[in-house]
């Protein structure tokens, strides 16, 4: 008789407006065959039951101060430190969502570049408490980039990993790991775990790549070298560099760099900005997609199941984004295959395309392809998963190819209709690539005159850079790969300079809220008002071993002739992390017929 090696722990029952009841079931010694029917009655009730009330807009933009949140990622440049001396100056920072005290409420952690990071405890009813000082997670005096929550030591509590970037210098320049002490305090322990890496780190993702029951780490670093130094030189990708990306294997609580032996590139041309985890080829093993800025192609690493990866972007993709930023993977057409969206910098309007966009010559495009840098285009990429036939790039067909200078892509069901929608964070505070500005800079006489008149010529030049806030992109999935712009209809049209973003059900009402980290303005916190309009299913998992929250678990649900697939990988989008929950919109359906759970060790459970 088969015994369940992992247990589905939490099922959320929503009855009416905001009421929730938790069911916990721990049949430690009962067999899979015996559990089959008892789970049927449980899952049948894991539904958000709805009324008929309507709200003015799908989302309400909350005032952060009313919630107890006072944070702003403020950036200011000097003659010594600015976009010319540090190319990622305006890339912004992230936001990580996670339940740090297991009270069922999702807490918020914001990273800041020149601002201290902030941790806010969710007190319920849209009230948050700043516990940064008590928790000891401010990361003062250094440039923080991304953040993610993961139970590193397997004690059932979420720990925090913060990646550092910016110019060298300052205290605690290394990435920091904060181990949760269980009393709303954390202990910095990066050196003890081998995670005290120093570099231009962007984000980390924790997952169990070798299926041994603990969490390993992929660390994304942006090259410290200038872009032009390696432009299209052959043979660079295979040369390891100490500041390159790293795959770190968890060996009894200490993380060891295994990049070379596992087939992971760790070169000086890895200008990485995004990590995306998913089972792209359907073998129930976690794969990796790495989006690279500038001339280097994106990487698709398929998990071999033999303790390593094989990079297959040339075989699986016909086209890639050129200046790839953030990315996300999710099933956009409910065929049970994860699709992929990668952001780039193509403006939406013709006017802005003429003033912002530059294009490579045909000769350079052809040269890049011939030297192994793939066919790359200056637009977003929407990669439809065709199974054994690879991916089809269909961004122009879907109308999603141009969303401005974009960062995070998030694919999640914003209206609980059973189809995952698209959210993209946009904006660059100072547009270094504005063609009118570049033309001005090309006038040697004007620049020479500025140098003669002002000692602080760099700051003066940056003052002249255009700065225009733009709305973030919000598209409703209408099915059939058709998407509708919903910014104004859903109340999300505020112009901004947005970067890291994450989604999660902050008030446990059965719909997904959204938090966005902005540059030089308060964060956006959007309350989703869908709870009275459609049903939803939320699942959390608990696995045996040290991967306590079941990172990498896949669930497929069947209901009323429909199907939907979700994967639990918190790190996603851009420098950010969403909670350890899977969310399925159900529309008008009030019952789920069955759930198939594929655990990180590839065992399966069927719940009916």
Mark where each language-model region is.
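Gly/Ser/Thr/Pro-enriched helix-cap/hinge segments flanking short amphipathic alpha-helices
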Residues: 52-58, 65-67, 77-83, 464-473, ...
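Short loop/turn motifs that recur once per blade in beta-propeller domains
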Residues: 58-78, 86-87, 129-144, 187-199, ...
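Beta-propeller blade repeat segments, especially FG-GAP/WD-type strand-to-loop junctions
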Residues: 59, 116-131, 171-188, 228-258, ...
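Hydrophobic beta-strand segments that make up the repeating blades of beta-propeller
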Residues: 59, 105-112, 158-164, 217-221, ...
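Beta-strand-rich domains and repeat architectures in extracellular enzymes and scaffolds
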Residues: 70-108
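Beta-rich catalytic cores
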Residues: 91, 115, 143, 173, ...
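Beta-propeller blade termini
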Residues: 92-102, 121, 144-154, 201-211, ...
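Short, conserved, GDST-rich strand-edge loop motifs in beta-rich repeat architectures
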Residues: 164-170, 221-240, 347-372, 428-466
